[in-house]
Amino acid sequence: MVEMKFAVRPERETPSPPAPPAGYDEPKLFEYPTLVLLLVSVPLFLLTAYGFGWLLWQIQGPEVFATLFAVTETGDSTVLVLDMIDVGLPFVVALFVTVAVHELLHGAVMRYYGQDVTYGVNLAMGAFYAAAFGQFQRREQLFPIGLAPLVSIAIGATPLLAVPVPSIAVTAYMVLVINTTGAVGDLYVVWCLRRMPEGTLMYDVDLRHMYVFEPLDVEV
């Protein structure tokens, strides 16, 4: 008789947060509702793609989309074929550059507030990141930290929709769609922060574990 043994892989322990500072309550684990955010990102993508697409159409006219589609007329019909070579490469470049700049802007604002910033790429999560691990971050500072990439890239890229060079205008359109859709997590954090009392602190242990420390002297 052959005896078979199976090793049970232990569950990964949640890293412990630091002790609460004087005047603060015990920490609470902050978690992203990943599935909900993925679902919300779909209509956000569609709304953003339509909104900036409409703006691009109004500024440049339909001719700008000739850089995206090859038009073939056959008899009484017109066929639009998406050129994956001319569109795919700029999209991939725009994706990586936008994500990298997005995180650099997060980090720039963190540094402005005197925080030590760690940049990196997490292949398991498929994400670039900028984080202030092992440091308390004030609620009031996290608003500009969270919104800086969304606002800055929108301000910088929107005027490029009017550049009379279709490849530049279309790339700017891609950047706007990617950046706005990718900010869904930032928008969720900002929404949560608005519901927290002034003086609240947040603390990143690692990429997956963030803790919230609320002050004890909160007036109800």
Model-derived features: positions:
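Metalloprotease/metallohydrolase-associated module, dominated by Zn2+-dependent proteases
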Residues: 2-60, 125-220
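Perimembrane loop-to-helix junctions flanking transmembrane segments
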Residues: 62-83
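Generic, low-specificity signal for short hydrophobic/alpha-helical stretches with a mild N-terminal bias
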Residues: 74, 79, 86-87, 129, ...
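Short pre-active-site segment immediately N-terminal to the catalytic Zn-binding motif
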Residues: 81-100
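Short juxtamembrane and helix-loop transition motifs at transmembrane-helix boundaries
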Residues: 81-84, 106-114, 131-139
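Active-site recognition of the HExxH zinc-binding catalytic motif
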Residues: 98-115, 149
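Membrane-water interface of transmembrane alpha-helices
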Residues: 108-121, 191-194
